[in-house]
């Protein structure tokens, strides 16, 4: 028996979807998994025969009873995901579907894909879901997979040495103002430092920082401030279901987080004293201004006690190992 994992390539280097899949794959390879590379491309350029040959090439090294971690979606359309899944089935392998996102739940216009998505999920031997809330939601649409693991948190592997921290009364947010409208509507006195290459007019208390490499970003954020996890109103329901990737970056940087109430990771933040949970964006200034130096440093200490789990990839290591055990276990 050998273990494999699919991996997305061909997106922009800033693509969170690709960064997340590449990160999981790097950890998997360190555990002895082999990579099944999947390139992003317009699938309509393939004839049915060409598509079949392409999928044969991806799967050519597989043997019966191998285990494949299938990271979904591939972002090559649901049709591609279905075809790849069923090609894997032909090879007689055990399939663990690792859900990063559920396209029908992300965008209202794609909800028509829900039945098809659930149908191929239900053929998996094991399912990894971002949260229990996501499991419950998918079960309400017909999910019947018995073996389910919950991810809980994105890792953010890094060897960057953390800087001495100061209680800076500012908030960090790596993100595109075109994607997150709350940035353009920022009306509170606390400075929001946005890391982006997009040029546009922003409110006076929004400080535009240049896009930075992961190492530069972690080092800069580790000097102090708060990491913000926030979604626009239209995305709040989905935020309660999935794991935001940037949360792991803040934890890796060793700074307190400010998150929106209802986020899927809320219990981890609360139980480990990693930051603050708020209901409305106006609450940010009150937290930043009222938190004392002593209180801030206490939370920083708790974050930096916890963050080796994220910085060294232990959430993903455990998840992948548990997935193999679950795939082979008869119960």
From Swiss-Prot:
Domain notes: Dimerizes via the C-terminus; dimerization is required for tetramer formation. Binds protein substrate via an exposed loop in the N-terminus.
Protein function: Required for polymorphic O-glycosylation of the serine-rich repeat protein Srr2. Catalyzes the second step in glycosylation of the serine-rich repeat protein in this bacteria. Transfers glucose from UDP-glucose to the terminal GlcNAc moiety of 3-O-(N-acetyl-alpha-D-glucosaminyl)-L-seryl-[protein] which results from the first glycosylation step of Srr2; does not use other sugar nucleotides as substrates. Complements deletion of the gtf3 gene from S.parasanguinis strain FW213.
Disrupted-gene phenotype: Altered modification (probably glycosylation) of Srr2.
Stretch list, region Substrate protein-binding loop: 106-111
Name of the protein this chain belongs to: Glucosyltransferase 3
GO molecular function, one term: nucleotide binding
Binding site for UDP: 16, 179, 211-214, 242-246
Family listed: Belongs to the Gtf3 glucosyltransferase family.
Protein's gene: gtf3
Highest classification ranks of the organism: Bacteria, Bacillati, Bacillota, Bacilli, Lactobacillales
Classification via InterPro entries: Gtf3
Keywords recorded for this protein, A-Z: Glycosyltransferase, Nucleotide-binding, Transferase
């Amino acid at each position: 028996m050998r273990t494999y994992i699919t991996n997305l390539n061909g997106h922009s280097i800033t693509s969170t979807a690709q960064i997340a899949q590449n990160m999981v794959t790097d950890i998997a390879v360190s555990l002895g998994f082999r990579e099944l590379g999947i390139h992003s491309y317009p699938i309509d350029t393939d004839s049915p025969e060409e598509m079949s040959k392409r999928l044969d090439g991806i799967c050519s090294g597989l043997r019966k009873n191998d285990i494949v971690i299938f990271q979904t979606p591939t972002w090559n359309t649901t049709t591609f995901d279905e075809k790849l899944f069923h090609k894997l089935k032909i090879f007689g392998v055990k399939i663990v579907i690792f859900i990063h996102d559920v396209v029908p739940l992300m965008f209202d216009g794609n909800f028509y894909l829900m039945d098809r998505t659930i149908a191929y999920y239900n053929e998996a031997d094991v399912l990894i879901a971002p949260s229990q809330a996501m499991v419950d939601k998918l079960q309400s649409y017909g999910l019947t997979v018995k073996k389910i693991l919950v991810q809980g948190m994105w890792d953010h592997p890094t060897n960057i040495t953390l800087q001495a921290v100061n209680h800076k009364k500012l908030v960090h947010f790596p993100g595109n103002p075109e994607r997150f409208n709350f940035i353009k509507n920022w009306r509170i006195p606390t400075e929001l430092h946005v890391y982006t290459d997009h040029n546009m007019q922003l409110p006076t208390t929004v400080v535009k920082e240049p896009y930075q490499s992961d190492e530069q970003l972690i080092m800069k954020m580790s000097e102090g401030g708060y990491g913000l996890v926030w979604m626009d109103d239209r995305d709040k329901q989905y935020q309660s279901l999935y794991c935001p990737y940037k949360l792991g970056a803040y934890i890796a940087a060793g700074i307190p987080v400010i998150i929106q109430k209802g986020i899927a990771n809320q219990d981890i933040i609360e139980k480990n004293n990693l930051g603050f949970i708020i209901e409305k964006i106006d609450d940010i200034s009150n937290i930043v201004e009222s938190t004392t130096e002593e209180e801030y440093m206490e939370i920083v200490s708790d974050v930096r006690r916890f963050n080796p789990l994220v910085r060294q990839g232990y959430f993903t290591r455990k998840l992948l190992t548990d997935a193999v055990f679950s795939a082979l276990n008869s119960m």
